[in-house]
Amino acid sequence: MSEDTTEPLVGSSTLWKELRTLLPDKEEELKLDLGEKVDRSVAALLRQAVGLFYAGHWQGCLQASEAVLDYSWEKLNTGPWRDVDKEWRRVYSFGCLLKALCLCQAPQKATTVVEALRVCDMGLLMGAAILEDILLKVVAVLQTHQLPGKQPARGPHQDQPATKKAKCDASPAPDVMLERMVPRLRCPPLQYFKQHFLVPGRPVILEGVADHWPCMKKWSLQYIQEIAGCRTVPVEVGSRYTDEDWSQTLMTVDEFIQKFILSEAKDVGYLAQHQLFDQIPELKRDISIPDYCCLGNGEEEEITINAWFGPQGTISPLHQDPQQNFLVQVLGRKYIRLYSPQESEAVYPHETHILHNTSQVDVENPDLEKFPKFTEAPFLSCILSPGDTLFIPAKYWHYVRSLDLSFSVSFWWS
């Protein structure tokens, strides 16, 4: 039998059958619907890859899809991300889809499913939705056919569960009793919250809002590894995003945990501001959108949900966001400082456009000769603990430092 007609993975014929049912039966039923901004040569190459797939020429399809990925990758990495045309992101997703499917038709390797998952994650991270979110459906099938993984690793302190392993190089929690604390309320009525906090733009910690969320009982380092360990995610490397040596990289959740949480890494790694729950619906089922978001003007699907996962010592410099924000703490604690938008002059925003929403001041070690007004600016502070939901009004300056291994979920809404 020729290489192009390789049988499905040995012992995994059901995998191929399940994957194949996700696509239309006939080639002409698979609509690419590419826009005019996609080069004709690339569009033709993608159509050729689709034709090879439906003809059963897996190796040829694999080569064509990789060429499509090479072309579209260049387009995705030319200029600012906001300027990348969505059509090129769709082309990239189609390339990832075809490559992942072809990999599952190749001769069996122990890493086949893991590699196909990585390819799908690249499409989810860098591409755009195609064929009614087919990449998410492919991932769901692949995950059911994964071989049982290794037990989540323990850290250097083998006598402690991994969830209790934490780096010791971060400074201790400030004594917030000496500072002006953020007020706390337990599940206030919607209209009370609106009248006293949302409309006037006042921060508040809401207790009890997330008590019923499954994540509050289920999530641990081991659980996150079991659900998401093999998934590829973006990781920030460096103490804070304003530092010159700050960078971003892609790695699996398992690699992130091993390198930055269970090991004494030289650098700080942070899975920050990532829409993890769109990528991994299994985790999304463990959380809920706070009822208070219904007081906004937007629709529920317009709410941006981000994950913030990292070791002790991660820092988000003092900055402001344009939308209302609920920050829910699931694991660990965070020290947070808040400054009113009225104090913008005293927090010395960067003058460059790209960092205009970020302060130049190192909040816990300020250079008062360079930034003399900062010491006079009033602020609120708090220690956010598991189950707490902090309301951060739009444009409110906030600084965040994790005191423990930490997982937070933010909801940005209008």
Curated annotation (Swiss-Prot):
SMART domains linked to this entry: JmjC (SM00558)
Classification via Pfam families: ARM_KDM8_N (PF24472), Cupin_8 (PF13621)
Keywords recorded for this protein, A-Z: Aminopeptidase, Biological rhythms, Cell cycle, Chromatin regulator, Chromosome, Dioxygenase, Hydrolase, Iron, Metal-binding, Nucleus, Oxidoreductase, Protease, Transcription, Transcription regulation
Residues annotated for a protein binding in this entry: E236, Q273, S316
Binding site for 2-oxoglutarate: Y270, S316, H319, N325, K334, H398, W412
Purpose of the protein: Bifunctional enzyme that acts both as an endopeptidase and 2-oxoglutarate-dependent monooxygenase. Endopeptidase that cleaves histones N-terminal tails at the carboxyl side of methylated arginine or lysine residues, to generate 'tailless nucleosomes', which may trigger transcription elongation. Preferentially recognizes and cleaves monomethylated and dimethylated arginine residues of histones H2, H3 and H4. After initial cleavage, continues to digest histones tails via its aminopeptidase activity.
Gene Ontology biological-process entries: circadian regulation of gene expression; fibroblast proliferation; G2/M transition of mitotic cell cycle; in utero embryonic development; negative regulation of DNA-templated transcription; positive regulation of DNA-templated transcription; protein destabilization; proteolysis
GO cellular component: chromosome; cytosol; nucleoplasm; nucleus
Domain of life: Eukaryota
Tissues and organs where the protein is expressed, per its UniProt entry: Expressed in a circadian manner in the liver.
Protein name from the UniProt record: Bifunctional peptidase and arginyl-hydroxylase JMJD5
Catalysed reaction, written as an equation: L-arginyl-[protein] + 2-oxoglutarate + O2 = (3R)-3-hydroxy-L-arginyl-[protein] + succinate + CO2
